[in-house]
Curated annotation (Swiss-Prot):
This is Serine/threonine-protein kinase PRP4 homolog. Residues 687-1006 form the Protein kinase domain. It is an enzyme of class 2 (transferase). The modification N-acetylalanine is found at residue 2. The gene is Prp4k.
Length: 1007
């Protein structure tokens, strides 16, 4: 009995502490419950009942609270019984135990006194100084105690995270470990209480008298307090049920924990609160009696708390390290952070975000050496009692523990840009040795790994040399993070794209870029290291790529194999996928720039070279092919044609006599709502029209010179004047603005909109001038032959970049085809245009006629839900057409389109067919394909049921055709075939993603 007695007593004392401190916290936050306000007078007459009245915190307590109270009562009874037994057994106890029990009794007395003093102070705070919660906040600002708000918040956050992390750990730990941890923490708390009791004893009696005087004063004040004020405070209390507490109660409901765990957690909480409050009380009473709230003292308090919480953290992490050496604390911490809902993240005070804990400590220290001194006396920190070795260990652990937090705060995503600039200088001071210490490198959190700084890139080779198991684990966590980040809205993606640095880009704003680079993260120290490492990394990647290419080459020889090439090598593909998406984008952008520089005047020459590779028989084949696929684009959508002649202008009705049809609404609008263009007229008092480009479904386009911008050339798109077209035009305007805002540096190859205006009730959009579209380029240069593989590679890079931007902005273009892709004069740069059919990804109405037919994805035809994959399919069809000069799927109907797609890829998966709304139009009950064709003789429709469809179209043969290709080009064509195979998967879920496409060997490897 004697053996088990002291621990239970101690537990009891700690439970009391937890309860009291929790109540005092509530009171401090201004939570005055109704019962308390009613019982105020009675409480002051009979002081003994104070605790009991405090237990009745809320009238309508929840079930858990009742349970807790029930347990509490039982504990009290046990406690009394034990005291009786203890009295009888005291003679038999050893002197050491007796002193321990004396200490505990003394501690209880002191706690009661402390609670009384606290209550008085709180009452004084409630009425003399502050009328309402708002007042409290204002007063905090007046006294210059911004730190105090910060501290409260930090305490809250700290509590939250500690409980969370402890819960995750608690689940993993073994019970005997728990007991040992308990014993350790108890012994520490005992030491601390002993220190405190000594301190308190040494306090003079004069101070006690002063406190009594205060008490009497506050009593009088309280009596005179107006009822209205009291009711106000009650209301506030009701409203401001502090969120942390509520959250805690929810956690308790949500997770049914083992009683041992719960007890441990409650003890921990109690201890934390106790530690935070008790040493400050005396100091506060002194301050308040003088009625001077000095900001200095507040700062002191904040430091105290901070130092204590840090020590606590380090202790906890030490215990963890002993228990499970496998799991690094940084991982633990970071995972906790990831799980925290993003909505809670912004709720931190901006000041706290801006300073890392270490820097804050430094700046504080330099501000007040005097305070520092006082603090060292005040906080009898347990870390001082550790041996020097252990202290050092705890310090490094502490640093590790703080690292993920600091990283999260310092990552460019969470910081405003101007903060970064200001902070960079400070980060230079923060010892570089520490920054590169091995412990730190080891504890790199996954978040950091994703960050964009060049540091990460420079370290990656080192990371690769880890053991396979760890590499695997980190890769898994990375992919999880990537998935998570994808799901978080496009907004953050957009902001990220602005912060991104493009190292290679020789743009006008390069000076600006350099500044940004130097100010982002702390990558100033080791630039030489970075360069070396980067070269090593590039070399490694090149070797990997070659291996992949070799593998693909052998697969490509067997032309009937459709696409298992990608999944067949998960290892190599994951290895090649190691660079971050941003690196890939940068590399591709650099490639495009290089292509532009090198091929300013070589476009026509390269096309001629391709013509020369063709053999004579090719011509016969092409004429046959021509009959099969009539050119539906002969005179249709030539929106941005390069040339215009008087015949075409006359045909479009330009320069005709306006008097010809007086019945029209206006003379400047024709019967179909198109604007009648007059060469030489001035639009919006600044655009001088000098040429007519052509007309599309929605609009006609003119060329003009902008008088307000030194006669800069522009293209003006004049939308048709009818309700539907106006609506479409406004939608296009909205999407263009969104895309242009998301891509300020013009890296992503979507058409730039300069401005818009109204002219004679027509909406006019002003664009950058581009000479011609790819349909015209094909017609003019590559008719039935296609373009050079170099050009196709560069165009594919640019199209994938455009898709990337569309995805970032959650937009589907839904009409990608050569007609809607414009090129500049030198045919090196292309821009995606015509967003008239575009929609938000969430508004994807199921319609079988979305996208031009030849470029329509199979999921649209069968009426399945669709997303960004439809644009990827269209790009695949376009790339084939650019290289061969022929349309890939020249279907006459939707049914024919499905037949042609299945001729290339085999029968559509049943799982996919079942999801289609229009499946019955193309498949029977047994999901066999019903091919509808027109009989050549009778010209009637006949239906052929096809249970199996084998892939008969040979993509590689079509791509190479009759060309005699040199080896380097042949290799490139094989790669293009492989890329198209992955793009043209019938099931959109298996279709290649944009990032994967950008990393494909065809895109990455130069010719």
């Amino acid at each position: 009995m004697a053996a088990t007695e002291p621990p239970s007593l101690r537990e009891q004392a700690e439970m009391d502490d937890a309860d009291n401190s929790e109540k005092s916290v509530n009171e401090e936050n201004g939570e005055v419950s109704e019962d308390q306000s009613q019982n105020k007078h009675s409480r002051h007459k009979k002081k003994k009942h104070k605790h009991r009245s405090k237990h009745k915190k809320h009238k309508h307590s929840s079930e858990e609270d009742r349970d807790k109270k029930h347990k509490h009562k039982h504990k009290h009874k046990k406690h009394k019984r034990k005291e009786v037994i203890e009295a009888s057994d005291k003679e038999g106890l050893s002197p050491a135990k007796r002193t321990k029990l004396d200490d505990l009794a003394l501690l209880e007395d002191l706690e009661k006194q402390r609670a009384l003093i606290k209550a008085e102070l709180d009452n004084e705070l409630m009425e003399g100084k502050v009328q309402s919660g708002m007042g409290l906040i204002l007063q905090g600002y007046e006294s210059g105690s911004e730190e105090e708000g910060e501290i409260h918040e930090k305490a809250r956050n700290g509590n939250r995270s500690s409980t969370r992390s402890s819960s995750t750990r608690g689940k993993l730990e073994i019970t005997d470990n728990k007991n040992s941890a308990k014993k350790r923490s108890k012994s520490r708390s005992k030491e601390r209480t002993r220190h405190r009791s000594d301190k308190r004893k040494s306090k003079g009696a004069g101070e006690m008298l002063r406190e009594k005087a205060n008490r009497s004063k506050s009593k009088e004040r309280r009596k005179s307090k107006s009822p209205s004020k009291r009711s106000k405070s009650q209301d506030q209390a009701r409203k401001s049920k502090s969120p942390p507490l509520r959250r805690r109660s929810q956690e308790k409901v949500g997770k049914a924990r083992s009683p041992a765990e719960e007890k441990m957690k409650s003890e921990e909480k109690g201890k934390i609160k106790d530690r935070k409050k008790s040493p400050i009380v005396n100091e506060r009473s002194r301050d308040r009696s003088k009625k001077s709230k000095s900001p200095v003292d507040l700062r002191d308090k904040s430091k105290d708390r901070r130092s204590r919480s840090k020590e606590r953290k380090s202790k906890r992490s030490e215990i963890d390290k002993e228990k499970k050496p496998i799991k690094s604390p940084s991982k633990d911490a970071s995972s906790g952070k990831e799980n925290r809902s993003p909505s809670r993240r912004p709720g931190r005070s901006p000041k706290r975000r801006s300073l890392s804990p270490k820097l804050r400590d430094k700046s504080r220290r330099s501000r007040s050496p005097l305070l520092n001194d006082r603090r060292s006396k005040q906080s009898k920190s347990p870390s001082r009692t550790l041996s020097p070795g252990r202290r050092a260990k705890s310090r490094s652990l502490e640093r590790k523990r703080r690292e993920p937090e600091r990283r999260r705060l310092s990552s460019p995503r969470t910081r405003p840009r101007d903060d970064i600039l200001g902070r960079c200088e400070r980060s230079k001071d923060a010892s570089p040795i520490n920054r590169w210490s091995p412990t730190r490198r080891r504890s790199r959190s996954p978040i950091r790994r994703r960050s964009r700084s060049p540091l990460r890139r420079s370290r990656s080779p080192r990371r690769r040399s880890r053991s396979p198991r760890r590499r695997d684990r980190s890769r898994r966590s990375r992919s999880r993070l990537r998935r998570r980040s994808r799901s978080r809205g496009g907004h953050r993606r957009r902001s990220r794209s602005k912060v991104k640095e493009d190292k290679f880009k020789g743009s006008l704003s390069e000076g600006m870029k350099v500044e940004q680079e130097s100010s982002s993260d702390d990558n100033l120290e080791d630039f030489d290291v970075e360069e070396e490492d980067e070269e090593a990394l590039i070399e490694q990647r090149r070797i990997q790529r070659q291996a992949i290419v070799q593998k693909y080459k052998y697969l490509a020889e067997d032309s009937n194999i459709s696409v298992p090439s990608e999944p067949s090598s998960p290892q190599s593909s994951t290895r090649s996928r190691s660079p971050s998406p941003d690196d890939i984008l940068e590399r591709v952008a650099a490639d495009v720039k290089e292509y532009e520089r090198e091929n300013v005047d070589t476009f026509e020459a390269s096309v001629k070279a391709k013509h020369n590779l063709m053999t004579v028989e090719q011509n016969n084949g092409s004429s046959q092919k021509k009959i099969l696929a009539p050119d539906m684009f002969t005179e249709s959508d030539d929106m941005f044609a390069a040339y215009f002649d008087s015949a075409r202008l006359r045909a479009a009705g330009i320069g005709k006599d306006f008097k010809e049809n007086p019945n029209l609404r206006d003379n400047w609008t024709d019967a179909e709502g198109y604007y009648r263009v007059n060469i030489g007229e001035v639009l919006d008092k600044r655009y001088n029209v000098y040429g007519y480009t052509g007309q599309g479904v929605f609009s006609n386009v003119v060329r003009a010179r902008d008088n307000a911008r030194a006669n800069q050339e522009v293209a003006v798109k004049i939308i048709r004047n009818n309700e539907l077209m106006q609506k479409t035009g406004l939608k296009e305007l909205e999407f263009l603005k969104k895309l242009n805002d998301a891509d300020p540096d013009d890296k992503f190859h979507c058409l730039r909109l300069f401005r818009h205006f109204y002219h004679k009730q027509h909406l006019c959009l002003v664009f950058e001038p581009l000479s011609m579209n790819l349909r015209e380029v094909l017609k003019k240069y590559g008719k039935d032959v296609g373009l050079h593989i170099k050009a196709v590679r560069s165009y594919s890079q640019q199209l994938f970049l455009a898709l990337k931007l569309l995805k970032r902005c959650n937009i589907l273009h839904a009409d990608i085809k050569p007609d809607n892709i414009l090129v500049n004069e030198s045919k090196t740069i292309l821009k995606l245009c015509d967003f008239g059919s575009a929609s938000h990804v969430a508004d994807n109405d199921i319609t079988p006629y979305l996208v031009s037919r030849f470029y329509r994805a199979p999921e649209i035809i069968i009426g399945k839900s669709y997303d960004y994959g439809i644009d990827m399919w269209s790009v695949g069809c376009t790339l084939y057409e650019l290289y061969t000069g022929k349309i890939l799927f020249p279907g006459k109907t939707n049914n024919h389109m499905l037949k042609l797609a299945m001729d290339l890829k085999g029968k559509m998966p049943n799982k996919m067919i079942r999801k289609g709304v229009f499946k019955d139009q193309h498949f029977d009950q047994n999901l066999n394909f019903m091919y509808i064709e027109v009989d050549k003789v009778t010209e009637r429709e006949k239906v052929t049921v096809m249970s199996t469809i084998n892939p008969t179209k040979d993509l590689l043969a079509d791509l190479i055709g009759c060309q005699r290709l040199p080896e380097d080009q042949r290799k490139k064509v094989h790669q293009l075939k492989d890329l198209l195979d992955q793009i043209l998967m019938l099931d959109p879920a298996k279709r290649i993603s944009i990032n994967q496409a950008l990393q494909h060997a065809f895109i990455q490897e130069k010719i």
